[in-house]
């Protein structure tokens, strides 16, 4: 996403614009490139002309930052957030339940380590009922070449839990960069 904010300035007969140009990652909403500044005051008062004159000198810098971000995504994966929650349906399952000698939270952590790009993720919360993984780096595309988002990545984890441990879960993916798996509910 590209955002442009600007203000129109008038000093005597001369006009300029002060602008802020930002590129945002559509998955995370984080700013990945940006430039700002004020154009040289001129006698023209047409806002599109003033914006073009103000921004054109900074576009190479903006584009190089954007390209660096794309290069980082290609090498290190796209960043998403994955949340795990346990639905209390009376089954007694929680993230401290044991499976093959490991707590379910450890099973999930191990899966994350094996399936993220270069094992990159941060466990920012881990309790009996919730786990939150931030800065999760996932591949840009699936094996079939289609784009991968947080929901498709979370589906892989959901299928793993069902196949290997018989754990029912539901994938709730409200956005491209965020997915939530609810364990104990289908």
Over which residues does each language-model region extend?
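Amphipathic beta-strand/beta-sheet edge segments enriched in Tyr/Trp
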Residues: 2-44, 176-186
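Short strand-loop junctions, especially beta-strand C-caps/beta-turns
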Residues: 7, 85-89, 141
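Short flexible/disordered coil segments
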Residues: 28, 32-41, 65-73, 137-155, ...
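C-terminal/domain-edge helix-coil "capping" segments
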Residues: 30-120
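Hydrophilic extracytoplasmic domains
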Residues: 99-186
């Amino acid at each position: 996403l590209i955002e442009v904010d600007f203000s129109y300035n008038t000093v005597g007969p001369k006009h300029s614009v002060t602008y802020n140009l930002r590129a945002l990652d559509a998955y995370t909403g984080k700013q990945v490139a940006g430039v700002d500044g004020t154009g040289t005051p001129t006698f023209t008062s047409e806002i599109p002309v003033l914006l073009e004159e103000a921004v054109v000198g900074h576009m190479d810098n903006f584009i190089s930052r954007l390209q660096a971000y794309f290069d980082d995504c290609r090498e290190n994966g796209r960043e998403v957030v994955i949340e795990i929650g346990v639905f209390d349906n009376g089954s007694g399952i929680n993230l401290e339940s044991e499976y093959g000698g490991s707590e379910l939270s450890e099973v999930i952590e191990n899966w994350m380590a094996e399936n993220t790009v270069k094992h990159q993720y941060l466990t920012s919360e881990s309790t009996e009922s919730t786990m939150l993984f931030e800065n999760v780096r996932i591949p840009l595309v699936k094996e079939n070449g289609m784009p991968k988002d947080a929901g498709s990545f979370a589906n892989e984890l959901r299928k793993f839990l069902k196949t290997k441990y018989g754990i029912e879960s539901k994938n709730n993916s409200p956005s491209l960069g965020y997915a939530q798996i609810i364990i104990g509910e289908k």
